[in-house]
Amino acid sequence: MLKTKRKLTKAIGVALSISILSSLVSFIPQTNTYAAGTYNYGEALQKSIMFYEFQRSGDLPADKRDNWRDDSGMKDGSDVGVDLTGGWYDAGDHVKFNLPMSYTSAMLAWSLYEDKDAYDKSGQTKYIMDGIKWANDYFIKCNPTPGVYYYQVGDGGKDHSWWGPAEVMQMERPSFKVDASKPGSAVCASTAASLASAAVVFKSSDPTYAEKCISHAKNLFDMADKAKSDAGYTAASGYYSSSSFYDDLSWAAVWLYLATNDSTYLDKAESYVPNWGKEQQTDIIAYKWGQCWDDVHYGAELLLAKLTNKQLYKDSIEMNLDFWTTGVNGTRVSYTPKGLAWLFQWGSLRHATTQAFLAGVYAEWEGCTPSKVSVYKDFLKSQIDYALGSTGRSFVVGYGVNPPQHPHHRTAHGSWTDQMTSPTYHRHTIYGALVGGPDNADGYTDEINNYVNNEIACDYNAGFTGALAKMYKHSGGDPIPNFKAIEKITNDEVIIKAGLNSTGPNYTEIKAVVYNQTGWPARVTDKISFKYFMDLSEIVAAGIDPLSLVTSSNYSEGKNTKVSGVLPWDVSNNVYYVNVDLTGENIYPGGQSACRREVQFRIAAPQGTTYWNPKNDFSYDGLPTTSTVNTVTNIPVYDNGVKVFGNEPAGGSENPDPEILYGDVNSDKNVDALDFAALKKYLLGGTSSIDVKAADTYKDGNIDAIDMATLKKYLLGTITQLPQG
């Protein structure tokens, strides 16, 4: 992925705006303004907000609504001794870039500020507020002391060189900061805007949190205002370089004014206006681009128009919206043949839907020129309908007709081999994600390597979410009741492949390879073992003690591999097994070597004997007779003692392991309500930090709701012994 090409700068914008302007040979598609909904805007809004749950980094909450994401980035900030866990991953990668992240959070807060009734009615207020708080909790961590701000976690180059799920990242994730000696005005001001806008929407429900946000917003704004420099903002270069900071300062100051009612901030916001970008060789405030992470003066001028009613801001925002709709002095943004207002190849839908949100906000204000109200509202509807399917296909993952199936997103893809081509399908549906969008001729290919048109990102959904709230408010649609992204597991998460490495008159040598291809969620396994079962009737008939057979291993990819001697399973039927223990080996779905461990082991009768017969062995059945391995099911695999793959022969011990404290899910040597909470979190979506063997309170080899019910009965005193079953 050439993420560098997602970078937008005003310099590029000026150059491109010249090439994309077109004569007004046609007008934007006419619609019946806010007619009965063409699409289910409620469902689209619901899923667009859910998208941000899939982007979360850090310690995920117990009430999460999926079963394929888990804690990740839990060491973020450890290199500088600061807890920098949390926040959102930027796009289809795992870097946390605070400039676009803070822009995104502020845009979501703006939408909630404008249309809280729509969120209340649709039942989405909790979810959008959770998302806004998730981002801003992280920003507060990034400002551990006044004058210091960590603006990025992760190295773009190292991050982009690996293709795998966030939960099993192994690369170093450096932290980068700005301060007085190395300033970053744009990112500090942008984050101040996010925190201040969060304070606005949390003021009534959580005034203490709102005040905390204001405190950090003021600190970051002061840093940005005093420095007026981006000289220290270097780590994001080539990804999210900033072309200016005065727009961010105005944006932040407006939100601080709304949060504090301190007119000093309103004055500050206006004081930066002369430094905003201008159209080439004019004194006209730039209008031939759109609201985005690198240029927020459009949002600032719209809010200033509403707050001050000054003609300067009204004229400027209307020129911008006219450029996107009817045109200005004979020029306007390009339109595709099917009606998308097309600004730029990277995130074309992001730009169109964000401008649609601004158009919707402004059209509802009484200060909007009356003759333009319907034009702006029509624009809002046409652009959102394009994204939702007016061309015959949806551009939103998990929504509508023919939605994208292969977005450029590592964790949603779920590769265990560090390859975007394996598997050939996406294991997860990242609901609500708006893909980049078509080219200027409506062309679009739904391919995972198409990072230009098919990547997804936090900022792509920001204005889109706000526009959907507008459409829901006016045209309705029903969110899906109790919607969750609980997926059916579509493949065995841990498997074993084996073959016959070598054989002789007195021995069998097995080549076995264990694979971790977990995805619900992806996780590191370090307690894997497997059993090779044998029918040793011929050994017993020869008068030999089966336990005297010799086992050995001449090759293992793991440093911690332990091959047991022959152990009894069902003595009455002469069934025995060898246990191969890989405890201590970190096997994870992160590469062709990382996801597997190979072991070659031998079971031998005494030298010179000829009674050895492997063909009646349970685990020999289905085993390839060459060293070319294939998946086998009669060599069961265990994770921390719990069978996760394959079959066992009949028999075996039915007695509980006396060393296991059943019900002690969190391994604190007690069985109490904390264990119930830990098991509930595991079942709601997954955490790998439980003792799965102790959690099997019903003793059926599965961890499920039956175990939770059994544990509950035990805690309530209905039953007095664990395990049951």
UniProtKB/Swiss-Prot annotation:
Residues 489-650 form the CBM3 domain. The active site is at 93 (nucleophile), 408, 446, 455. SMART domains: CBM_3. This is Endoglucanase G. Residues 1-35 form the signal peptide. Pfam families: CBM_3 (PF00942), Dockerin_1 (PF00404), Glyco_hydro_9 (PF00759). InterPro entries: 6-hairpin_glycosidase_sf, 6hp_glycosidase-like_sf, CBM2/CBM3_carb-bd_dom_sf, CBM3, CBM3_sf, Dockerin_1_rpt, Dockerin_dom, Dockerin_dom_sf. GO terms for biological process: cellulose catabolic process. It catalyses: Endohydrolysis of (1->4)-beta-D-glucosidic linkages in cellulose, lichenin and cereal beta-D-glucans. The biological conversion of cellulose to glucose generally requires three types of hydrolytic enzymes: (1) Endoglucanases which cut internal beta-1,4-glucosidic bonds; (2) Exocellobiohydrolases that cut the disaccharide cellobiose from the non-reducing end of the cellulose polymer chain; (3) Beta-1,4-glucosidases which hydrolyze the cellobiose and other short cello-oligosaccharides to glucose. Gene3D superfamilies: 1.50.10.10, Dockerin domain, Endoglucanase-like. Residues 658-724 form the Dockerin domain. Its EC number is 3.2.1.4. Keywords: Carbohydrate metabolism, Cellulose degradation, Glycosidase, Hydrolase, Polysaccharide degradation, Signal. One of its GO terms (molecular function) is cellulase activity. Pathway: Glycan metabolism; cellulose degradation. Belongs to the glycosyl hydrolase 9 (cellulase E) family. Disulfide bonds: none annotated.
